[in-house]
Design a protein with these regions (language model features):
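A structural signal for short, well-ordered beta-strand segments and their strand-loop junctions
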Residues: 46, 55, 126, 144-146
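Bilobed "Venus flytrap"/periplasmic-binding protein-like clamshell domains
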Residues: 2-23, 82-142, 149
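N-terminal hydrophobic or amphipathic helices and topogenic motifs
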Residues: 1-76, 87, 100, 205-209
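Active-site regions of enzymes building and remodeling cell-envelope glycoconjugates
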Residues: 68-72, 122-123, 158-162
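General small-molecule cofactor/ligand-binding pocket signal
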Residues: 33-37, 124-127, 162
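Pocket-lining segment of extracytoplasmic ligand-binding domains
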Residues: 128-209
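Hydrophobic/proline-rich hinge and linker segments of small-molecule sensing/allosteric domains
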Residues: 70-93, 169-187
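Short loop/helix-cap segments at secondary-structure boundaries that form the rim of catalytic
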Residues: 63-65, 114, 153-156
Length: 209
């Protein structure tokens, strides 16, 4: 049976889905029609109910909980690896009210954290996550929220840290930050959903072996 699978280009996703996509493991008769996209595109597709299985920002899950359920494998939960708010020029948190801020998507966990900790930051502009650093460097935006590899390379590009949103989450909650989930459509019957769960778990275990 062929299922529509949508994942991001993030190394986390390619790492854990490689085995099932390339049949390095038993997929129990499942085949996959793969789409790779930016996380905000994945969120939008899930909001439209399109994929059978998809990566999704945890911040978006309440919007699709009637159509999708979270699988027990594949979630990105972490400490010390959350989104970073950065700027080119010195910028204090109390100056964010008037700042133009690049974000990786309206429905991303990164944007939800920004809204939670800096509700006064209202001038938000959506960019592809990989273009955010350049938007700040070119002064198209005063600040930007970096995710994925951008959080590890920003200093080398001449950007400076304004706030570590993941660290702030951990300080306030003492919990790991829920970044992304793998969800399965409620269109799939219970038996098929359990098969997907087993295959994904097997793929993750293969990746770590």
């Amino acid at each position: 049976m062929k299922l529509k699978l949508s994942i991001s280009t993030c190394p986390n996703d390619t790492f854990m889905f490689d085995a099932m996509l390339h049949r390095r493991i038993d997929t129990e008769g499942l085949d996959f029609d793969l789409t790779m996209a930016d996380i905000e595109q994945l969120n939008a597709a899930a909001l439209a109910g399109e994929p059978d299985i998809t990566k999704l920002s945890y911040a978006s899950f309440p919007l699709v909980a009637d159509r999708y359920r979270i699988l027990g494998s594949g979630s990105a939960l972490g400490r010390g690896n959350g989104p970073l708010l950065v700027s080119r020029h010195k910028l204090y948190p109390d100056e964010l009210r008037d700042a133009r801020i690049a974000i990786p998507g309206e429905h991303t966990t990164a944007n939800r954290l920004l809204s939670l900790f800096f509700p006064e930051a209202s001038d938000k502009r959506v960019y592809l996550f990989s273009d955010i650093a350049d938007a700040v460097l070119s002064d198209e935006c005063d600040a930007g929220v970096l995710i994925h590899e951008g959080r590890f390379t920003y200093r080398g590009k001449g950007l400076r840290l304004v706030a570590d949103l993941g660290e702030e989450w951990e300080k306030r909650t003492s919990l790991p930050l829920p970044l992304g989930a793998i969800v399965v459509s409620r269109r799939l019957d219970e038996q098929l959903a359990r098969t997907v769960e087993r295959v994904l778990r097997r793929s993750v275990e293969y990746a770590f072996a």
